[in-house]
From Swiss-Prot:
The gene is mltF. Residues 1-15 form the signal peptide. The lineage of its organism: Bacteria, Pseudomonadati, Pseudomonadota, Gammaproteobacteria, Alteromonadales. Keywords: Cell outer membrane, Cell wall biogenesis/degradation, Lyase, Membrane, Signal. The keyword Cell wall biogenesis/degradation applies. This is Membrane-bound lytic murein transglycosylase F.
């Protein structure tokens, strides 16, 4: 009996020992948390530039703020041309493109487009002294544009109306290079957006705008066509916030408003003065500027005296920085006609104004308030700020103050103020002029640095070649 029970128990246990399929557990690595916003861009005055003062540009500033909104670090990645930008976005090298690109049907087919940042016109550009184009159909093969640009889309649409219209495309050049080729007379026509044209003619005053080919075209950011829903949602939320709090309007004023006014004679004279006069005073501007950007100090001096140390005004101001006698005494300046003393006094006075300004004025706008004060007096600027506040405007935003300053010339408004009448309209033009001069100095400074870097590379390459030839001579090898 016991033997039977033992046998049954053994059989039961054996039956329970069937092979069990154990499913292999696959360990899924945790998702890597994103820490950087990679933004593809191209170099351009209003898009993205690197200077001794750091990175700048409309698209850069917006991208920096968007990265802050996402609580990510920003990495700007400049590419050589638009084709490379597209490839980088499609391959995932960058999360979005912020490069001053326009909204076009072709881009809508291939990417997701963000909301409009600002709007531009497309203009046909030619050189002063050559015939002004009257009709696009007459140009035939004389137009050169950038490959993959919005201008190719525009010309393709026009070609349906004018079948004989043809054009050349350049892949390895940017729009500013083509504009420089126009200025040198190397090509006849190109197309540029109105902001790039307006900025570039400050350095190349020979440029002229002919026909307007497209109006009010939106400048947008590009996102991948797939898997970008979350990023697009964040971008739209961010854009609405920036629009409501005035950031978009501020950046538009900062980068574009002051370049719309253009004076060919003044621009040519300034470029000549940079070559002929500035070298005499550059080191002094750099020294006495201290923590200020010396180029803003130099631009102010040019606006005041055209860098003439003996300049005099019927109102009593004198010297390179055109100081009044009381201001000179206050700054410890004995001789206003001495260039070094004048620069020292002007820098000290300007720095003093900056220190007096209310903390509510943002750092990136304080200089414009200070320059307006330098021109018409601190009290009048304070009057304008109070007027702005009474009108429901922001007294600490330059874009609002420049609208109010001209009102100081109207009795209806200046009778409400403490300091009375002032030529506020002149103060606005004064600041705009200095900003244009400053932008030109920055551009030329950057060009000179690029030339120096290229020259250093050439010399390094030549030295390497000489060393290689020397080594071959020592070993007895024949140079190739």
């Amino acid at each position: 009996m016991n033997r039977i029970l033992l046998t049954l128990l053994t059989l039961t246990l054996l039956a329970g020992c069937q092979r069990v399929a154990v499913e292999e557990t696959k360990l899924v690595p945790p998702a890597v948390e994103k820490t950087v916003l990679n933004v593809g861009t191209i170099y351009g005055s209003q898009i993205y530039v690197t200077t001794g003062q750091g990175e700048a540009g409309f698209d850069y500033e917006m991208a920096s703020r968007f990265a802050d909104h996402l609580e990510l670090e920003l990495a700007m990645k400049p590419y050589s041309n638009i084709k490379e930008l597209y490839q980088a976005l499609n391959s995932g090298e960058v999360d979005l493109i912020a490069a001053g690109l326009a909204d076009t049907p072709t881009r809508r087919e291939n990417f997701r487009l963000g909301p409009p940042l600002y709007r531009v016109n497309q203009v046909l550009v030619y050189k002063q002294g050559t015939p002004q184009p009257k009709d696009i159909s007459q140009l035939k093969d004389e137009i050169t544009v950038i490959t993959d640009s919005s201008f190719v889309d525009t010309l393709s649409q026009l070609q349906k109306i004018y079948p004989e219209l043809v054009w050349d495309q350049e892949q390895d050049k940017d729009n500013e290079e083509l504009l420089a080729m126009i200025a040198r007379g190397e090509i006849s026509y190109t197309i540029a957006d109105s902001t790039t044209f307006e900025i570039s003619r400050r350095y190349m005053p020979e440029l002229r705008a002919g026909l307007t080919l497209k109006e009010k075209q939106a400048i947008v950011w590009l996102l991948p066509a797939q898997n970008s829903d979350k990023l697009m949602s964040e971008l739209l939320t961010f854009w609405h916030g920036e629009k409501l709090d005035g950031t978009l309007a501020h950046l538009d004023e900062k980068y574009f408003a002051h370049v719309k006014r253009f004076d060919y004679v003044d621009t040519r004279a300034f470029l000549r003065a940079i070559d002929n006069k500035l070298p005499k005073y550059k080191e002094r501007f750099q020294y006495y500027a201290g923590d200020l950007d010396w180029r803003k100090l130099a631009a102010t001096a040019y606006q005041e005296s055209h860098w003439n140390p003996n300049a005099r005004s019927p109102t009593g101001v004198r010297g390179l920085m055109m100081l009044t006698l009381p201001t000179a005494k206050q700054m410890g300046i004995e001789n206003r006609l001495d260039a070094e003393q004048s620069i020292k006094g002007g820098a000290k006075y300007l720095r003093g104004i900056l220190n007096r300004l209310p903390d509510s004025i943002p750092d990136n706008q304080r200089m414009w308030f200070a320059l307006a004060s330098y021109n018409i007096g601190y009290g009048h600027v304070e009057d304008a700020r109070k007027l702005a506040e009474s009108m429901g405007l922001n007294p600490s935003a330059w874009r609002d103050l420049k609208e109010v300053l001209p009102l100081l010339q109207k009795r209806k408004y200046y009778k409400q103020t403490r300091y009375g009448y002032a030529r506020g309209n002149e103060a606005v033009h004064y600041v705009d002029n200095i900003r244009r001069y400053y932008d030109t100095l920055v551009w030329i400074d950057n060009q000179n640095k690029l030339l120096e870097e290229n020259q250093a590379l050439i010399e390094e390459s030549q030295l390497a070649d000489q060393i290689g030839i020397g080594e071959k001579a020592i070993t007895g090898a024949q140079p190739e």
